[in-house]
């Protein structure tokens, strides 16, 4: 099975249908993006189902009947078709279902997908077909979205501290909506992009989140009025307020409290005769806990309706919500070492029954897809591709590189493995591929696309 490179990503299952690709992508190159094409105009008139059908053909998305084929069977069927020692199975059906749930729970909140979470071509194209907008944090992310044929009005440049070169690029391609949180940024924008539409990012209480951003981004509520006054003096257009409660948010109160802060900024702006029309509630949405998601979205629905008039546009920046559950990583054991109790070195473990311990070396590690264990607080669980009747034994899972910190999981227990056995890890779609490197020459795994939603259901989107 062969793969091709697109935006730096290896996409497998390519059917190499150039006509379909041209129709779907609506690709004028970025430096030609000011020219409207017949293809992009006609494509915009297609239904969601028709757009998804084009995307599925381009990515060669295979149907997956989960009632008949388990994830283990699906992975096993791919082993004879690839020579790679690690690969992803991506279910676009998960992304579609997450979008349906979003529309049901937050019908008045427009999602701007956080590209940094998973910038792969499959995820971006499926979300584009569904009508999702994009949160970009860099020139490269903006380029990747514009290359889909996305109108620049569907992008928010949500990085409060931007490079001058990136500001110039955004201006050249009419990406106007962007965040700021300090005077220096206002001065840059005044000089290099004075027509920009600005969103003031405030610092909410993010103490109830796993990953907090308040120490780096967001202006304190007491300093908001001064920044608004400065923007007005510079004749810059401030259109709204944003916040981010942090990744892995644990309480809906964080959104409620932040929205109350946003309302106070709206009141400040009103006294300065500045009309704000946009609220960006940021990210922090879970992709796997429906109960928590339902609770958070209820708070957002009720609080935005209570605090803001209907003409105020509400947007959000979900990332892991769409991507996390969509990807499963399959990885093989490339080496194995038996460890004596007295020779367990950096990863000591003592067992009461002198059970043998093992070091297993996997084809992917923390410099690759498992970087989420270091930077995203992910808890990964190794699952056996083939069932085993053996008793679990103590072990440590290492990645393939020559660095000793390349430890995927230490002091765990799984049945004894042999070289060539396969493990798989679920919920690996968020902050894995995006942050992986080619350290030691180990390239990121390819992605195989499938769809678990029946055709009849897709027709009703």
Swiss-Prot record:
Alphabetical keyword list: Decarboxylase, Lyase, Polyamine biosynthesis, Pyridoxal phosphate
Biased composition (Low complexity): 13-22
Keyword Lyase (UniProt): yes
Pathway: Amine and polyamine biosynthesis; putrescine biosynthesis via L-ornithine pathway; putrescine from L-ornithine: step 1/1
Site (Stacks against the aromatic ring of pyridoxal phosphate and stabilizes reaction intermediates): 244
Entry binding sites for pyridoxal 5'-phosphate: 247, 284, 317-320, 431
Class of enzymatic activity (EC top level): lyase
Domain of life: Eukaryota
A GO MF term: ornithine decarboxylase activity
GO cellular component annotations of the record: cytoplasm; cytoplasmic vesicle
Required cofactor names: pyridoxal 5'-phosphate
Binding site for substrate: 375-376, 403
Region Disordered, residue ranges: 1-35
Regulation of catalytic or functional activity: Inhibited by antizyme (AZ) in response to polyamine levels. AZ inhibits the assembly of the functional homodimer by binding to ODC monomers and targeting them for ubiquitin-independent proteolytic destruction by the 26S proteasome.
EC annotation from Swiss-Prot or TrEMBL: 4.1.1.17
Active-site residues (renumbered): 402 (proton donor)
GO biological process, one term: putrescine biosynthetic process from arginine, via ornithine
Compositional bias (Basic and acidic residues): 23-32
PANTHER family: ARGININE/DIAMINOPIMELATE/ORNITHINE DECARBOXYLASE, ORNITHINE DECARBOXYLASE 1-RELATED
Role description: Catalyzes the first and rate-limiting step of polyamine biosynthesis that converts ornithine into putrescine, which is the precursor for the polyamines, spermidine and spermine. Polyamines are essential for cell proliferation and are implicated in cellular processes, ranging from DNA replication to apoptosis.
Subunit structure: Homodimer. Only the dimer is catalytically active, as the active sites are constructed of residues from both monomers.
Family, as annotated: Belongs to the Orn/Lys/Arg decarboxylase class-II family.
Protein name: Probable ornithine decarboxylase
Organism: Dictyostelium discoideum (Social amoeba)
Name of encoding gene: odc
